[in-house]
């Protein structure tokens, strides 16, 4: 389920979108995937205005409501990929989802340096992404994650990224999929 923020009205898309997906269960679908960016209301005034019209202060409040609605109306199991989350966010969303995820992409801080692919993107910092992954683990949330190949990383950095994910999983036992 794509939750667009700028090009279409969130109210119409949210509620009509749910009706559109009602036939998914009959087609054999079991899960509804919600994927979106990191708190777009902080970056785009249009997103904040749309949320406000709907009576929500944050994207995560809206996501929580939509995940619950999809589950109640269709029986599809919500899997949430909403970007960076803190422990409080995970606690709130855990009540309306069967699993969550975020791509680690890379554990290399080098990719954050000027001239590299994650420069100027604080949400891509390995430490904050690993923090979300570990917070989910502490709460026993089934989790999916992954690495990004082809972004300028070295073979060694790919291996280190996989090892960082293994370390988190060995500690908490929550990662069920690495893509």
Question: What residue ranges belong to the model's regions?
Answer:
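A glycine-rich, aromatic-flanked flexible loop/lid motif
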Residues: 139, 171-179
């Amino acid at each position: 389920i794509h939750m667009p923020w700028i090009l279409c009205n969130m109210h119409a898309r949210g509620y009509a979108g749910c009706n559109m997906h009602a036939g998914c269960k009959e087609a054999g679908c079991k899960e509804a995937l919600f994927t979106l960016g990191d708190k777009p209301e902080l970056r785009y005034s249009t997103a904040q205005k749309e949320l406000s019209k709907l009576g929500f202060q944050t994207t995560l409040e809206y996501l929580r409501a939509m995940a619950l609605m999809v589950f109640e109306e269709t029986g599809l199991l919500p899997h949430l990929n909403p970007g960076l989350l803190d422990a409080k966010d995970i606690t709130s969303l855990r009540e309306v989802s069967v699993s969550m995820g975020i791509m680690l992409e890379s554990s290399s801080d080098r990719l954050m340096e000027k001239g590299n692919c994650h420069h100027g993107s604080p949400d891509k910092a390995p430490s904050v992404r690993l923090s979300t992954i570990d917070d989910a683990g502490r709460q026993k949330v089934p989790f999916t994650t992954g690495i990004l190949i082809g972004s300028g990383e070295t073979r060694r950095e790919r291996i280190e990224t996989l090892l960082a994910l293994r370390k988190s999983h060995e500690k908490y036992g929550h990662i069920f999929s690495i893509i």
